[in-house]
Amino acid sequence: MAQEALTPQMWEALKAVKEVYRKNKTLTLISHAEGRVWANKVFFVEEDGYLYGVVERPQDGRGHHYRNIVQNPNVFFIIDRNVPDRFLQGEGQVELLGDVTERHERHILFRKVPQAVLFAKFFPLLVFRLRPTRLYISDYTEEWKPRARVEVTEEVFKAFQGPLKTRPRPWRAYWQGVRSFSFTVTLFSILLGAFLAPALSWPLLLLTLAGGLLAHASINVLSDYFDHRRGADTWLTLGSSRVLLDGLLPPGRLLLFGMVLLLLAAGVGLALTALRGLPVLYLALAGAFLGVFYTSPPVGLKYRALGDLAVFLAFGPLMALGSYYVQAEGFSPVPVLLSIPLGLLTIAILHGNNFRDIMDDSRAGFRTIASLLGFRGSGIYYLGLVVAAYGVTVVAIGVGWLPLWGLLVFLTAYLAWRNLRAAFQPRRVAFTFLDLVTAQLHFYFGLLLVAGVALGRWVG
C-alpha cells in the first residue's frame, strides 16, 4: 500500500535515501538552542524510518547536544561519505530515550555499528531516536539531477517499515558467529606444517585445512555460547562476536550450530585418520579438548589462567605437527619449533584482549594471566611474547631448520614496535585495539614465515 501511495519520483528518492542510510555509519548532528549551536559526528542506524544513535551525557564539560535538545528537540543532520556523489541533508525531532546502560535500543545501533560499543565503554552516553520530518537527497551517482525534497509523512514511514525495510539475512548472523577474521591463525599453522613435510599432497592439505577451519569455527561459536551462559560477556564486551549480546540468534540455536560445526570437523578428522593412521586422531582429540574446554564447564581453562597455554598448544605446535604428520606420516621437531612464533603471537592476540579487560574480568571474578599480572606485568608479558617470536625465528635459522628466507618476518618489526609502545601506554587509543593490531602483526608475520618456508622449499 505504501508503494502505491507514492509517486515514482518519490519512490526513487526514497530508495536513494535508503542507500545512504545503508552505506553510512555516522551522521553529522546539528542541534541549537538559545543561540548555542553544536555539531559533531555521531554513530547511527536506521530502523523503520527512525534514526537511532548515541550522544554524550552532560559531564565534565561534555553534553552540548543534550543541553540543546532538552530545550529544542528540532535538529538538522547530514549524512555523507565525504564524497559529493550521494548525500542526505535532513531535519527532524530528537527524543532522548535514556542512558545507554539501561535502554535495549542500544542493540539496534550495536548490530550495525559495533564500534559504538567502544565509546559506550569509555564515555557516558544517552540513546536517542530521531524522527526525520524533511529530507533532501542529492544523488549524482548516475546523472545530474535536481536535489529531491521529501516530506516524511506517514506514507513515507510505511515505506520504510514495509518495502524498504532492511530484512536480516540469517546466514549473516551465523557467519558473524564463527568470527572468520581469526581463521588466519589456523591457516598459517597448517600451511607451515604441510610445507615443511618432505612430500606434499595438495588433496590432503585441502582436507586438513577444511578440518582445521571447521574446528576453529566451532570453538569460536561454543566459546561465545559458554561465555554468555557464564555471564562473562556483557553488552559492553568487545571481544565476542556479539551474536548473542545483540539478539541476532537465540542461545540454543548458536549452541546447535557450534555442535554441528564440531561434528563436521570430527568427520574430517576421522577421514584423515582412516587415510593416515591413529596419530592423527590423538592429535585431533588433544586439540579438541583444549578448544572445547577453553570456556565450557566443568574445566573452563580460560577462567583458570590456563587459556594462554591452551591457545598456544592448540594453534601452534599441535596444529602444525598434525598438518606435518598428515603429509609425512611421521613426526619431526622442526614443525614444533617453527610453530612456536605463531603460537606466541596467537597468545599475544588473546592477551591483548585480556589486558584491555583487566578491570572487567577482575570485577567478574575471572582469572586470566593479565588479571594476575596487572597492568605493568601484562605489558612486560606482552613484550616477552612478541620479542620471543622473533628470537625463536632467529634460532630456527641458526640451527638450519628455517631457510634465510625466514628473515622476511623482520619486515614486520615496525608493526611490533608500534604495538609494544601501545602496550605500555594504556591511556592511548591504540591500547584499546591492542588485540586487533596484534592480529594484524600475526597475519603479516605468519604470511611471511610461511612464504619463507615455501621459498626455501621451491626456490632454494
Regions from the language model: what does each represent?
Residues 2-11, 86-164:
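Charged, gly/pro-rich active-site loop segments
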Residues 236-275, 367-401, 439-445:
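Multi-pass membrane catalytic core of lipid/isoprenoid biosynthesis enzymes
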Residues 241-242, 246-333:
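Intramembrane alpha-helical segments
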Residues 192, 198-225, 281-289, 333-352:
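Membrane-embedded alpha-helical segments that form the functional core of polytopic membrane enzymes
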